[in-house]
Amino acid sequence: MTDVNSAAVGGIRSPSPGHRALPVSLTVNSSKGLVSEFFEWFGDLGIFFWQVVRAAVTPPFEIRELVRQFDEIGSKSLPLVALAGAATGVVLSLEARYSLTRFGAKSLLPAAIVFSVIHETGPIITGLVVSGRVGAGIGAELASMKVTEQIDAIEASAVNPYRLLAATRILACILMLPLLTLAGDACGLLMGWVAQALVEPLSLHQFISSGFNGASFNDLLPPTFKTAVFGLIIGLIACFQGMRTQGGAAGVGRAATSSVVLSSLFVILADVVLVKLILIFFP
């Protein structure tokens, strides 16, 4: 495996002796050690991202592998995202009905459900669900390839592992997350309407027209496409944790776990920032 100072193009950076990917439990002897470990990890992540971008824009492009990742990340995540979205829609509908009825604002119920699902619960639930499923899968898969030296073999065969393994998965995450979010939103709104229709007569047309009354593209598109940033975070961290793991089978488990925990954490933090930016630029 090439060292970070090697001039070999596309080489995977090997951790220095005793250095490993940022663990889930950051147990260190001092706060200074914690801070230095985090910034070292974050710097390595930035270098990894630059190497992936450079490989992604350099031919040849791995179209076949990208399409395979579309299916793996998008199609196979759809049932779980749909189920989570539907459950969220039902719970939100019941809670919103109870709260708005207490304040005499039951007429605003469809709009409250629509805006809550599209603006926040749909995107963040989709991001966390995909982070759990896809993050663990990518982290474990690439970590297994690393400890069994398959990545070394790919590099030895003159194939850039950043392009074949990382860029395709990250790009698939970026492109699939908005589509999965739309599917999750649709399921959430549909089940939100069902939950209301079981309580009082309310047609789907009435629910949609009342819920989307006054809505604009500024209300709909930015919250949906912020999940592309979630996709970047999930794919980048999962690939990074997987491709730099070490320690045999135990390392594979640590890579999978840390991929899920770290990507979920950064998705939540990114959501806070993106919500504020959306409110500033799309009031």
Regions found by a protein language model. Give the residues of each.
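Short cytoplasmic-facing helical segments at TM-TM junctions of multi-pass membrane proteins
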Residues: 142-167, 249-252
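Active-site cofactor/substrate anionic-group-binding motifs, chiefly glycine-
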Residues: 69-125
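Generic alpha-helical transmembrane segments of integral inner-membrane proteins
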Residues: 83-90, 174, 178, 182, ...
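Hydrophobic alpha-helical transmembrane segments of integral membrane proteins
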Residues: 163, 167-170, 262-282
